Amino acid sequence: MPKKKLTPPPPARQLRADAKRNRERILEIAKDAFTRDGAAASLDDIARRSGVGNATLYRHFPTRDDLIEAVYRSEVEKLAAAEQRFATTMPPLEALRAWMLLFIDHVAAKTLIIPVMDTVVGGSMRLIEGSRNLIHTAFSTSVKRAIASGELRADTDPNDFVRALVGVFHTTALPGWEQSARRLVNILIAGSRPTR
C-alpha cells in the first residue's frame, strides 16, 4: 500500500480588520483591568467594556491564561516596535536613550501586572523568558547603531546595557527605583562615550 503523502497545515489565517480591532481593544481593556483588579479581573467585564460578546473574547483567548499571556506579549512587541520607530526618527544615541527610558516605563508598568502574570501556569518567569529575545535584540541593535555612528566606543558591549537595565527589574520594590534607573541610563551612556 503506498504511503499517504502528508500535506502541510494551511497557513495561519489573517484576522479580518474588524476582528483585529476587537482583539486589540480586548487586550487594551484587559491590561487596564488586570492592572487595576489583579488576576480576579472579570472576563465578562473585559468583554463588555471592549464592546464584544463573551463568545468573541473566548474565540480570541480561550482561557484567562491565554489572555494574560497575550497582554504581556503585546506590550513587549510594542516595546520592540518602538526601538525600530526611534531608529528611523532620531539620531542613534538619542534613539538608544529614548528606548532605554521607555524600557524603564515598561518595567514600571510590569510591576503592577506581575502578580497577575504569576497566576499563569509556569508563572511570570515563563512569560518573561519568552520575550527575552525581542528585548535583547532591541537593545543590541540600538547599541550597535550608536557604535556605528561613533557616538559610543567601539568596545561597548550591548550585553552590559542589557544586564544593567534588566537588573533594574530586581530593584522595583525599593523607594525611588525609577529615578535611580533613569540616572543609570545617563551613567551607562556617558561611560560608553568615546574619549575626545
What are these regions (language model features)?
Residues S42, L112-D118, E151, D155-T156, ...:
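Short, hydrophobic secondary-structure boundary micro-motifs
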Residues G51-F61:
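Short hydrophobic/aromatic patch on the recognition helix
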Residues L127-L134, A148-R163, T172-S180:
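All-alpha amphipathic helical-bundle segments outside canonical DNA-binding/catalytic cores
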